């Protein structure tokens, strides 16, 4: 199923998902440094593997995907399938509602 078929996202629920499943490796704060994973500020509309100052896998650099609702929805289902060779160890979010919530949060928090 595509993002177009996803349930409406709830940013508050997405923030909880981010804090429990993403924040150990990522931040969304403008100007903050990278953690284990890259800072996600400015994520929407950015090409994969291009955040300055972060050492990406060749897989992320070569994928050249532009991050948006549709690409994130597919990526977050199964990151290692979407970008084979990615360094991201997160197994993904199988529930469409959780992916929609996280994307709704990221859209607000990374702008």
Curated annotation (Swiss-Prot):
<feature type="modified residue" description="N-acetylalanine">
    <location>
        <position position="1"/>
    </location>
</feature>
<dbReference type="InterPro" id="IPR002327">
    <property type="entry name" value="Cyt_c_1A/1B"/>
</dbReference>
<dbReference type="Pfam" id="PF00034">
    <property type="entry name" value="Cytochrom_C"/>
</dbReference>
<comment type="function">
    <text>Electron carrier protein. The oxidized form of the cytochrome c heme group can accept an electron from the heme group of the cytochrome c1 subunit of cytochrome reductase. Cytochrome c then transfers this electron to the cytochrome oxidase complex, the final protein carrier in the mitochondrial electron-transport chain.</text>
</comment>
<keyword id="KW-0813">Transport</keyword>
<feature type="binding site" description="covalent">
    <location>
        <position position="25"/>
    </location>
    <ligand>
        <name>heme c</name>
    </ligand>
</feature>
<dbReference type="InterPro" id="IPR036909">
    <property type="entry name" value="Cyt_c-like_dom_sf"/>
</dbReference>
<dbReference type="GO" id="GO:0005758">
    <property type="term" value="C:mitochondrial intermembrane space"/>
</dbReference>
<protein>
    <recommendedName>
        <fullName>Cytochrome c</fullName>
    </recommendedName>
</protein>
<dbReference type="GO" id="GO:0006123">
    <property type="term" value="P:mitochondrial electron transport, cytochrome c to oxygen"/>
</dbReference>
<feature type="binding site" description="axial binding residue">
    <location>
        <position position="26"/>
    </location>
    <ligand>
        <name>heme c</name>
    </ligand>
</feature>
<feature type="modified residue" description="N6,N6,N6-trimethyllysine">
    <location>
        <position position="80"/>
    </location>
</feature>
<keyword id="KW-0488">Methylation</keyword>
<feature type="binding site" description="axial binding residue">
    <location>
        <position position="88"/>
    </location>
    <ligand>
        <name>heme c</name>
    </ligand>
</feature>
<keyword id="KW-0479">Metal-binding</keyword>
<feature type="modified residue" description="N6,N6,N6-trimethyllysine">
    <location>
        <position position="94"/>
    </location>
</feature>
<dbReference type="GO" id="GO:0009055">
    <property type="term" value="F:electron transfer activity"/>
</dbReference>
<dbReference type="GO" id="GO:0006122">
    <property type="term" value="P:mitochondrial electron transport, ubiquinol to cytochrome c"/>
</dbReference>
<comment type="similarity">
    <text>Belongs to the cytochrome c family.</text>
</comment>
<keyword id="KW-0249">Electron transport</keyword>
<keyword id="KW-0007">Acetylation</keyword>
<dbReference type="InterPro" id="IPR009056">
    <property type="entry name" value="Cyt_c-like_dom"/>
</dbReference>
<keyword id="KW-0496">Mitochondrion</keyword>
<dbReference type="GO" id="GO:0046872">
    <property type="term" value="F:metal ion binding"/>
</dbReference>
<keyword id="KW-0679">Respiratory chain</keyword>
<feature type="binding site" description="covalent">
    <location>
        <position position="22"/>
    </location>
    <ligand>
        <name>heme c</name>
    </ligand>
</feature>
<dbReference type="GO" id="GO:0020037">
    <property type="term" value="F:heme binding"/>
</dbReference>
<keyword id="KW-0349">Heme</keyword>
<keyword id="KW-0408">Iron</keyword>
């Amino acid at each position: 199923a595509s993002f177009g078929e996803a349930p409406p996202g709830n940013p508050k629920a997405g923030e909880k998902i981010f804090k429990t499943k993403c924040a150990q490796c990522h931040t969304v704060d403008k100007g903050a440094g990278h953690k284990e994973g890259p800072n996600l500020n400015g994520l929407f509309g950015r090409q994969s593997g291009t955040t300055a100052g972060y050492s990406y896998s060749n897989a992320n650099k070569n994928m050249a995907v532009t991050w948006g609702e549709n690409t994130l929805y597919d990526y977050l289902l199964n990151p290692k399938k979407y970008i084979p060779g990615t360094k991201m160890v997160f197994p993904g979010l199988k529930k469409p509602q959780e992916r929609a919530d996280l994307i709704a949060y990221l859209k607000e928090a990374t702008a």
